[in-house]
Amino acid sequence: MKNDYRTFKLSLLTLAPIHIGNGEKYTSREFIYENKKFYFPDMGKFYNKMVEKRLAEKFEAFLIQTRPNARNNRLISFLNDNRIAERSFGGYSISETGLESDRNPNSAGAINEVNKFIRDAFGNPYIPGSSLKGAIRTILMNTTPKWNNENAVNDFGRFPKENKNLIPWGPKKGKEYDDLFNAIRVSDSKPFDNKRLILVQKWDYSAKTNKAKPLPLYRESISPLTKIEFEITTTTDEAGRLIEELGKRAQAFYKDYKAFFLSEFPDDKIQANLQYPIYLGAGSGAWTKTLFKQADGILQRRYSRMKTKMVKKGVLKLTKAPLKIVKIPSGNHSLIKNHESFYEMGKANFMIKEIDK
């Protein structure tokens, strides 16, 4: 008989760009585009250098200045105007892919804002365990009959919403402590190199028009074919059983998700799976983060109160990145089936196995 405490190794393989944000953005006054690279200097070190060069006041005025011409509000403009060739300000660089902007390959320098990837205390990018845990929760919610039913919707109040009390979560007064997801503990990933990051643009593909529309939203994202590992520890029999079944549950979730949503879009925009499927991070679409069958109708009403409406089931969330080929037993396999460099934003695969600790 197995002990309550069990440990699993989850190996994640990104099939598309994945963005885990920290809620912050770089403005055009905080990064430099030149020589086919985006350079994000350490702004503290940058300011100290300006103090040394007696340009601190001038730089402060530049930061609060508003000019009609956006080009003149860029950090590169300040450097050029003050004849500063130095670039030793710490920070990091991200190489250009040529697909950052919808306009043309030479317009990457016109990007005004970049959503930051989350970083640890040492400034290194990583994936928090809470992000993976949220994706696991979505899979388990959609594949467990006692949660995936009519009780999943709370009709109390003006607008229906998810019933947060369906799954035991946290202490409840007068009740025995029961918190399933506290019994599923997901580690943070190890930090990875900035070389694994690319900049990507948001694209929305409409099933109604069969066209992809670019949006002026840019994200630091993990590039496709990046391998990242996590440890999952379970502390109860129920939690251990659910994680043991995570692979087949992920396949069941994807089968239903594809029938519900992905089937409405061209097959060449949908990526094939190599392992167990999962969607992670920002920009993968609302249906990948909820009980989609129960949320159908609720999400549309919620979006009706926003500036951007959801028509029917909404749009497919895509982005562009360079073509990647992976070797599989049957030969070379392209991660995408289209010639436009479109990937499903946030898509990944994983393998999982129990390990001894």
Curated annotation (Swiss-Prot):
Q: Which family does it belong to?
A: Belongs to the CRISPR-associated Csm5 family.
- Organism of origin is Streptococcus thermophilus
Task: Tell me the domain of life.
Answer: Bacteria
Give UniProt keywords alphabetically: Antiviral defense, RNA-binding
Please explain the role this protein plays, according to its UniProt record.
Answer: CRISPR (clustered regularly interspaced short palindromic repeat) is an adaptive immune system that provides protection against mobile genetic elements (viruses, transposable elements and conjugative plasmids). CRISPR clusters contain spacers, sequences complementary to antecedent mobile elements, and target invading nucleic acids. CRISPR clusters are transcribed and processed into CRISPR RNA (crRNA).
Which gene holds the coding sequence for this protein?
Answer: csm5
Remaining remarks: Encoded in a type III-A CRISPR locus.
What this protein is called in its record is: CRISPR system Cms protein Csm5
Q: How does it assemble?
A: Part of the Csm effector complex that includes at least Cas10(1), Csm2(3), Csm3(5), Csm4(1), Csm5(1) and mature crRNA. The Csm complex is elongated and slightly twisted with a maximal length of 215 Angstroms and a diameter of 75-80 Angstroms. It has been modeled to have a central protein filamant of Csm3 subunits along which the dsRNA helix of paired crRNA and target RNA binds. The filament is capped at one end by Cas10 and Csm4 and at the other end by Csm5; ssDNA is thought to bind to the N-terminal HD domain of Cas10.
| InterPro entries assigned to the protein according to its UniProt record, in alphabetical order | CRISPR-assoc_Csm5, RAMP_III_fam
Q: Which GO terms describe its biological process?
A: defense response to virus
